[in-house]
């Protein structure tokens, strides 16, 4: 029996079922424990990044090679002949998809991954980020990291801190965790960077409990997961940014009353929002989280390219 992810476009977390998310998390754990360099042997995967990326691109390309695949592609689409000659994205996708078995793509334009899926001639498209819209593989590694540290994906207390308005990682993770039972969310952000209304409306419809806070200190003792994000300086004037930034900097002292199982996650890169003394605490998990990106992406690629896995 074919798994439901076989040959499926991975465009948005919202389009993945709870069962599919659980399958990816389970497979990631299996591949971390027991590597399999034959899973996509003789498969060729395009890694096409139309805007610069470090972690996501290297993580995907590592994952492809560790499970036996080959990689073609580029890491700065603006410098390719495709862009310089004025070729449309649709035509570029048509051409590249004729060479490969799967198509991993990052693009600055929202909706670009969806467009690519319409012109890929049936080749599965994996969205590696389209503007501020979606970044599903980041959410998959977040889910795997949560499961690895907590042993479950339900009945969790999770705080999202920082830029909740523009941060695509927090939108997708909230949507994913809403598919599981009895999760409780704490949204900690300045009013100008609050979680978007559409996410809150989705949570209301799903019956997910959430609370809104302006500071994080009072919620830390209640948490299993503390998901930090960067407050973006460019969205504020200097005086406002200085005030907001200081309210959302996590130090080791903040964790003195934390639950023993609390883990701090961050999509990286961090700037000032987590001080380096947190790195030495048992709560820090953001570098392990980055490593888990390889296993989550191995699992995703293996399931998309193997009918019976």
Swiss-Prot record:
It comes from the Bacteria. Pfam families: OTCace, OTCace_N. The keyword Transferase applies. It catalyses: carbamoyl phosphate + L-aspartate = N-carbamoyl-L-aspartate + phosphate + H(+). The keyword Transferase applies. Belongs to the aspartate/ornithine carbamoyltransferase superfamily. ATCase family. Catalyzes the condensation of carbamoyl phosphate and aspartate to form carbamoyl aspartate and inorganic phosphate, the committed step in the de novo pyrimidine nucleotide biosynthesis pathway. This is Aspartate carbamoyltransferase catalytic subunit. The gene is pyrB.
């Amino acid at each position: 029996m074919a798994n439901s992810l076989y040959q499926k476009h991975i465009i948005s977390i919202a389009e993945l079922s709870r069962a599919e998310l659980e399958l990816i998390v389970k497979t990631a754990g299996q591949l971390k424990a027991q590597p399999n360099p034959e899973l996509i042997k003789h498969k060729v995967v395009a890694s096409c990044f139309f805007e610069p990326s470090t972690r996501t691109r290297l993580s995907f390309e590592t994952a492809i090679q560790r499970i036996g695949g080959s990689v073609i592609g580029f890491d700065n689409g603006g410098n390719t002949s495709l862009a310089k000659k004025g070729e449309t994205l649709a035509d570029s996708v048509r051409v590249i998809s004729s060479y490969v078995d799967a198509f991993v793509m990052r693009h600055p334009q929202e909706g670009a991954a969806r467009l690519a899926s319409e012109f890929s001639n049936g080749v599965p498209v994996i969205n590696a980020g389209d503007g501020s819209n979606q970044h599903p593989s980041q959410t998959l590694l977040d889910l795997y990291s949560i499961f690895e540290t907590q042993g479950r994906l339900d009945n969790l207390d999770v705080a999202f801190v920082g830029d909740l308005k523009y941060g695509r990682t927090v939108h997708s993770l909230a949507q994913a965790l809403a598919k599981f039972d009895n999760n409780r969310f704490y949204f900690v952000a300045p009013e100008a960077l609050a979680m978007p209304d559409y996410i809150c409306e989705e949570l209301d419809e799903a019956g997910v409990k959430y609370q809104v806070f302006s500071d994080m200190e009072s919620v830390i003792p209640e948490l299993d997961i503390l998901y930090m994000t960067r407050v973006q300086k460019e969205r504020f004037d200097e005086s406002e940014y200085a005030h907001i930034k200081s309210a959302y900097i996590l130090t080791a002292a903040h964790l003195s009353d934390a639950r023993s199982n609390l883990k701090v996650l961050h999509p990286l890169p961090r700037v000032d929002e987590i001080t380096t003394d947190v790195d030495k605490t048992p709560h820090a998990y953001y570098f392990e989280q980055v490593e888990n990106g390889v296993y989550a992406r191995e699992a995703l690629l293996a399931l998309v390219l193997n009918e019976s896995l």
